[in-house]
Amino acid sequence: MSKAIIVVDFAYKGTQRKGHGTGRKGLSSTLKYLQYRDKVQNRLAANRDYERWQDRGMGIHWRDIMKNSDALQSKHVLAWTWVISPAPDLMALIPEAERRDLVCDLTERIVEDYYLERGFGVPEYSYILHDREAKMEDEGETMQQLHTHVVLPGTAPLDGVDRAAVYNNKERGHDVLFREIASRHFSEALDRIVGPEWQLLREEPEIEPDQPAPNDLDAWFPRS
């Protein structure tokens, strides 16, 4: 199996608190962490007027997002939280000045297409871009890992009704759809910016069958 070109995942915060990290308290803690976790390096992050969140309807501050999550929750889901993380080795092929805009553009395309392909209208959402150093499994070196955290409501617009509950179930193939959409958009971006040669980083090495030594006649031509 070839290595993934982009990692995506979804999780949710339920409407009821059922332990540590769940319910409204769990969501508010997560939002605060996402908003302020790099404030040592980026002191503007603690400023109410600093737009760290990219607002597509849920707000530019954790309090706004919390308020909108309350208003747009479903019976069981207060908010969905996504992670979208393109592979660092492939992102390294992108000119540095273009990387952040690319990840933001990818995030918006993935959100929009996922909901449209599920039959919903595009819901309100907000996302935040994080930048960290990640250790690569194979090489042991660290590389820049740009990724986004997306917060979406428990409901979405649906034709014929005002809004409907959204559930993401692996058993129904929603995770496969999520990965396919993300991979499609990232591969198209790589083709456009880098060219098809990026695919060389994802080709599986050919495994040659063990062959006998050239002078081993018994192996090539077994004795009768």
Sequence positions of predicted segments:
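N-terminal nicking endonuclease/strand-transfer module with a His-rich metal-binding environment
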Residues: M1-S224
